[in-house]
Amino acid sequence: HEKLIPAKNYHNSLHHLSHAACALYQTDYQEALIISFDGGGNDGFFNIYLTKDRDNIQLLEKYNLDLGFPYMSFGDYLSDIRKEPALNIGNLVYSGKIMGLCSYGNVNKKWLPYFENYYRRKPDGLNYKEYLNDLSNETGLIFDINNRLTGQTAWDLSATSQEAFENVFMEMAQPFLDKYPNIPL
């Protein structure tokens, strides 16, 4: 980046700490519990912070779990979503479209534990197809880019994935919400 953007000084910033600071400084909170998670940065995927004075944001926990990749990975297999030429391009658009499809679907309680397990297994660009194959065997869903899921099945997949995402998120967040019940999130 130094060759592309000339400057006198460069400051390296931690990705999630920057998210945490941005969130905090847009409020008037003196203390806060802050959760920053996304597809990753130079300081992890899912970080939980505590600040008690607006000047010091303390890292409480760093989970090595990317919830973004498994969430968006279903986009290739849903016919309501335009298939992108490569998953890394879909990474930028699939999640929002899947969120929209959730409203049409119903959570399939039989599928739910398998979807939660899919999230916990840390799928990434190298192993997600293997993990989707396991999910297929467990749920009966077929993940085939040449025969994409349609209608209620696709919508139920979206809703079930959303519920699994939220449940796994809460597994990580709840201990801190319990420990700091009077500190705003």
Residue spans of the language-model regions?
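Short acidic/glycine-rich loops and adjacent helix/strand connectors
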Residues: H1-L185
